[in-house]
Amino acid sequence: MTIHYVDASAWAKLLVDEHESGALAAYVDERLAAGETFASSHLLVTELHQLAARVSAAPTDVTAVLSVLALTMPDAATYRAAGLLPGSVRSLDALHVASALDLGADDFVSFDERQLAAAAAAGIPAANPSNALGDST
């Protein structure tokens, strides 16, 4: 089973219409149809609800975009692992990378280059849906 770990920079594009939103939606649809899994940490729930409040999106929209994800709850070991990741990674980014490691994610889906670099440094291949689908961004 293929597991694609996603962060807020990616999944937010399913909530807010941005340039890469169409590419991400196509990427997700294609992989879900193939039986692949998208996953994230429960941190994403907070991140998306905060985003929704900032852009006046309905909480039901957040629930809808979260509904296709397998969500994991970071435990104390995940927090410790996040603190020990190499480089100077922002705290939430480190928690996402550590959560992806816990899940055994096959790749890390993000539009945040620093986040992708942190994932790659931890041994998780980076995935950028725009690049995968031939978008020029």
Kindly give the residue locations of the regions a language model identified.
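Phosphate- and divalent-cation-binding pockets in alpha/beta enzyme and binding domains
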Residues: 23, 47, 117-119
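Short, well-structured N-terminal submotif of metal-dependent ribonuclease cores
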Residues: 1-38, 52-63, 122, 131-137
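Glycine-rich, small/polar surface segments that engage phosphate groups of diverse ligands
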Residues: 41-42
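Amphipathic alpha-helical segments within well-ordered protein domains
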Residues: 9-12, 49, 83, 101
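N-proximal accessory regions
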Residues: 27-31, 46-87, 128-130
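Active-site neighborhoods of divalent-metal-dependent phosphate/nucleic-acid chemistry enzymes
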Residues: 70-117, 121-124, 137
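Acidic-residue sensor for enzyme active/binding pockets
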Residues: 18, 47, 93
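Conserved beta-strand edge residues that scaffold enzyme active sites
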Residues: 45, 114, 132-133
